[in-house]
């Protein structure tokens, strides 16, 4: 089920404060560490660099593409590592 049209996009207050501070100081190259994977990428985040926590590490996310706006930060930092499907077990045993 999608989000209602009348609701504004969600952005955690701490993330909003960090983005506003980075834009005010002009520190575009500084990496902003965030834990809020549910926050939506807004147009004022364009050109900033984030480090999104996936539960273990901080994954670097650079918001440099116009197509990223409207997506959530969690979409760009995977939480699971794909190890691959089973292959030839005889070859791995040698």
UniProtKB/Swiss-Prot annotation:
The keyword Heme does not apply. The keyword Transferase does not apply. One of its GO terms (molecular function) is structural constituent of ribosome. Keywords: Ribonucleoprotein, Ribosomal protein, RNA-binding, rRNA-binding. One of its GO terms (biological process) is translation. InterPro entries: Ribosomal_uS19 (IPR002222), Ribosomal_uS19_bac-type (IPR005732), Ribosomal_uS19_SF (IPR023575). Coiled coil: none annotated. One of its GO terms (cellular component) is small ribosomal subunit. HAMAP family: Ribosomal_uS19. Belongs to the universal ribosomal protein uS19 family. NCBIfam families: rpsS_bact (TIGR01050). Protein S19 forms a complex with S13 that binds strongly to the 16S ribosomal RNA. This is Small ribosomal subunit protein uS19. It comes from Wolbachia pipientis subsp. Culex pipiens (strain wPip). The lineage of its organism: Bacteria, Pseudomonadati, Pseudomonadota, Alphaproteobacteria, Rickettsiales.
């Amino acid at each position: 089920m999608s989000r209602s049209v009348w609701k504004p996009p969600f952005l955690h207050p701490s993330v909003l404060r960090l983005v506003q501070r980075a834009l005010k100081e002009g520190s575009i190259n500084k990496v902003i560490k965030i834990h809020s994977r549910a926050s939506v990428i807004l147009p004022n985040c364009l050109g900033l660099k984030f480090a999104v926590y996936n539960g273990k590490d901080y994954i670097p996310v650079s918001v440099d593409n116009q197509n990223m706006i409207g997506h959530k930060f969690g979409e760009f930092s995977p939480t699971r590592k794909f190890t691959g499907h089973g292959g030839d077990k005889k070859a791995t045993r040698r």
